[in-house]
């Protein structure tokens, strides 16, 4: 799929975010390196990033930046139409309560230094939702997932404690399945919300409370890596040379 310099923003109210932060939208090349190869992106900003923990934040400027560094199942094209990203294909049952996704093979998680850490797999989406729905983690977007995923609210509230009862599972290494509380033909659009972004469970466990505290404490599978961060000055992103779609 064709990539612009910066992907369109992911948000809980995507149309509002696109209007208010169009500098980062599709087709923008403002702030790119002089050679025009999109190898570096510099962003001047007015709002501070407080966390890179995309599974916890609901701040527009934070997940707006993170959406350029972490790919998820689907994304929007420049016309606002959902298209494949980490999911190559999907299907839903007749009443739109069970959704099955095939995960793109060969996608890499990399560190800030560009070292390969692991492959992106279906389990990464299970692990991320488990984190979001654990009320001890105080995810600001938990209500979105809890309101649509089967038994999500019950797990979040503590009514059930076995996460296997929650409507998400890795059928196999590259097949992911969500089961919903009710029919939701719009579910694809919800998958652009940060609560449905993937995370490598091993890395998340290793980092603990340090996850997302700085660029070294997250992994990247998207087109850019957070290179340098100067508070109240600028952010510098560099192209991820392990990116699965870097040639486009």
Regions from the language model: what does each represent?
Residues 74, 78, 105-108, 130-138, ...:
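Sec-exported extracytoplasmic/periplasmic mature domains
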Residues 88-144:
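Aromatic- and charge-enriched surface segment that lines or borders ligand/interaction sites
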């Amino acid at each position: 799929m064709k990539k612009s310099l910066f992907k369109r923003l992911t948000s809980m109210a995507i149309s509002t975010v696109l209007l208010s932060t169009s500098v980062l939208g599709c087709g923008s090349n403002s702030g790119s390196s002089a050679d025009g190869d999109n190898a570096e992106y510099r962003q001047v900003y007015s709002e501070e990033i407080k966390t890179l923990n995309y599974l916890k934040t609901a701040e527009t400027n934070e997940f707006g930046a993170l959406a350029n560094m972490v790919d998820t199942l689907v994304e929007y094209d420049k016309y606002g139409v959902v298209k494949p990203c980490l999911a190559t294909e999907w299907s839903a049952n007749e009443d739109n309560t069970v959704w099955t996704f095939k995960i793109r093979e060969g996608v890499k998680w990399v560190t800030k230094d560009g070292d390969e850490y692991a492959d992106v797999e279906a389990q990464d989406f299970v692990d991320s939702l488990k984190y979001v729905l654990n009320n001890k983690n105080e995810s600001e977007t938990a209500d979105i997932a809890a309101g649509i995923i089967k038994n999500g609210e019950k797990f979040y509230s503590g009514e059930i404690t076995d996460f296997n009862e929650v409507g998400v599972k890795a059928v196999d290494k590259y097949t992911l399945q969500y089961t919903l509380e009710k029919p939701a033909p719009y579910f694809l659009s919800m998958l652009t919300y940060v609560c449905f972004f993937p995370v490598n469970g091993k890395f998340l466990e290793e980092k603990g409370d340090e996850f997302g505290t700085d660029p070294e404490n997250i992994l990247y599978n998207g087109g850019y890596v957070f290179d340098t961060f100067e508070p109240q000055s600028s952010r510098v992103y560099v192209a991820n040379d392990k990116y699965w779609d870097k040639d486009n």
